[in-house]
């Protein structure tokens, strides 16, 4: 290094060159600082946007899972338990008042001690029929607006709808065989029944109420089911022999209207407590989504302020 030759101009020229180089070095440092700041800002913005998106997705998935699990488990369980308990109580009340109002002694207490009763076998007051074979293939190939009822107990026994009907008007139907043999329903519409259903049509509607017949039969039908056979069964022959007592038509209708309204409240899928349970579940879903979105927005606002 000591042997390297260096040429020097006069001192005044050396000083001018050194001043120029110092100025250039200073400008270079300033430019480097500005470029560094600008690049840092751009990079920060890009990273912030990318990080925000990634973090938002992670938070969304995490919060959604946690919030959904916690709210659904806690609120849904509490709501379901509360309303289900209420429904059970209403059904107990219904069973109590049904049994009470269909008792001859109680009817006389309410409507008068001299209320007369007449006793008849089902065969004496009803035309008795049975449904026809309607399988799933027939339901698929003949879609329509008219209900088809079978031995099912959910949804009133409805199994589908077709484009024609076998019966029109007031009927009482019962399940002839299977686990639900002896279940009784009131119908008043255009409909059809499968082979697992029997039908009763009141002959004299000026003397007998189909609704009252339905409620009175519900108290007795299960007693006449043959549970000794391989499949429980309540045959047409057997149901025809059931004896029921009837007060005057006016009293029948009053009792039937009370029981029908109470039963509708307890069991109808579009009214009463079951509908309330469904409505509350929809409200739960709404507020759950609302709270989740609110929390998520708050988290994103915090990220943007970083």
From Swiss-Prot:
GO molecular function: DNA binding
Keyword hit for DNA-binding: yes
Domain of life of the source: Bacteria
Pfam families linked to this entry: Methylase_S
Keywords, in A-Z order: DNA-binding, Restriction system
SUPFAM superfamilies: DNA methylase specificity domain, MgtE N-terminal domain-like
Gene Ontology terms describing biological process: DNA restriction-modification system
InterPro entries: Restrct_endonuc_typeI_TRD, Restrct_endonuc_typeI_TRD_sf, Type-I_RE_S_subunit
UniProt entry tagged with the keyword Nucleus: no
Function of the protein: The specificity (S) subunit of a type I methyltransferase (MTase); this subunit dictates DNA sequence specificity. The single R subunit has multiple frameshifts and is probably not expressed.
Membership in a protein family: Belongs to the type-I restriction system S methylase family.
Subunit and partners: The methyltransferase is composed of M and S polypeptides.
Domain statement: Contains two DNA recognition domains, each specifying recognition of one of the two defined components of the target sequence.
Protein name per its UniProtKB record: Putative type I specificity subunit S.MpnORF285P
Higher taxonomy: Bacteria, Bacillati, Mycoplasmatota, Mycoplasmoidales, Mycoplasmoidaceae
């Amino acid at each position: 290094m000591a042997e390297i030759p260096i040429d020097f101009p006069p001192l005044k020229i050396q000083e001018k060159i050194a001043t120029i180089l110092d100025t250039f070095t200073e400008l270079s440092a300033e430019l480097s600082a500005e470029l560094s700041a600008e690049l840092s800002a751009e990079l920060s913005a890009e990273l912030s946007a990318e990080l925000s998106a990634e973090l938002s997705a992670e938070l969304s998935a995490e919060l959604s899972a946690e919030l959904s699990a916690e709210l659904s488990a806690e609120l849904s369980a509490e709501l379901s338990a509360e309303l289900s308990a209420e429904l059970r109580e209403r059904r107990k009340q219904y069973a109590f008042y049904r049994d009470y109002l269909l008792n001859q002694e109680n009817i006389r207490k309410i409507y008068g001690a001299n209320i007369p009763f007449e006793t008849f076998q089902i065969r004496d007051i009803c035309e008795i029929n049975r449904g026809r074979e309607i399988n799933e293939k027939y339901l698929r190939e003949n879609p329509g607006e008219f209900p088809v009822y079978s031995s099912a107990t959910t949804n009133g026994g409805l199994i589908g709808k077709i484009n024609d009907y076998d019966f029109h008007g007031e009927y009482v139907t019962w399940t002839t065989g299977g686990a639900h043999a002896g279940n009784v329903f009131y119908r008043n519409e255009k409909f059809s029944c499968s082979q697992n259903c029997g039908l009763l049509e009141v002959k004299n509607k000026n003397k007998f109420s189909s609704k009252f017949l339905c409620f009175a039969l519900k108290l007795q039908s299960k007693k006449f089911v043959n549970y000794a056979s391989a499949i429980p069964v309540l045959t047409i022959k057997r149901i025809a022999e059931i004896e029921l007592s009837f007060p005057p038509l006016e009293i029948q209708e009053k009792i039937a209207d009370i029981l029908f309204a109470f039963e509708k409240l307890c069991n109808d899928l579009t009214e009463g407590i079951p509908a309330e349970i469904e409505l509350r579940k929809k409200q739960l879903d709404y507020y759950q989504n609302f709270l989740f979105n609110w929390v998520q927005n708050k988290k994103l606002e915090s990220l943007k302020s970083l």
